[in-house]
Design a protein with these regions (language model features):
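Conserved SAM/SAH cofactor-binding pocket of Class I
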Residues: 1-44, 54
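Short alpha-helical
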Residues: 6-7, 48-52, 81-84
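Short, well-ordered alpha-helices that flank and scaffold nucleotide-derived cofactor binding pockets
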Residues: 14-17, 59, 88-91
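Short, well-ordered coil/turn elements that cap or connect secondary structure elements
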Residues: 21, 36, 69, 90-93
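Conserved beta-strand segments of alpha/beta enzyme cores
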Residues: 23-25, 73, 94-95
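A short SAM/SAH-binding and catalytic strip from SAM-dependent methyltransferases
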Residues: 39-61, 76
Length: 121
């Protein structure tokens, strides 16, 4: 788990410890500065436009999938209209509307965008 804000990472480290999670490594670093590691999934809230975010992470995926239903890729929490932004990048994606799963007004415009890793096909 990555965030540039130290207070957030401190909380995440405590949660990881309290839950006894073994496959989580919180790091205080900016996503665009991650260069050496590869990941199965990259999960993010919309920190910037996808055209800026995608180049930061596109080479950061492991080739072997760990999930039967989803191949490795990006899960991106985003509000508003995502289609125009994503279609401009010519990427395959699936948009999950959170209002289909949660009733609170906050989720009415929120989506999780799944972009599968395309590098192994």
């Amino acid at each position: 788990l990555v965030d540039s804000i130290g207070k957030k990472i401190s909380v995440v480290k405590d949660v990881v410890k309290q839950l006894g999670l073994k496959n989580v490594e919180p790091q205080q670093v900016r996503a665009e500065n991650l260069m050496s590691r590869k990941y199965h999934f990259i999960v993010s809230r919309a920190v910037t436009q996808m055209e800026k975010f995608y180049p930061w992470v596109k080479g950061r995926f492991r080739k072997e999938d760990v999930h039967d239903e989803f191949q490795n890729g990006i899960l991106y929490l985003k509000g508003g209209d995502v289609d125009e932004e994503l279609e401009a990048l010519h990427l395959n994606y699936v948009c999950y509307h959170l209002e289909d799963y949660f009733r609170e007004p906050f989720f009415e415009t929120k989506k999780v965008v799944y972009i599968p890793f395309e590098g192994k096909r």
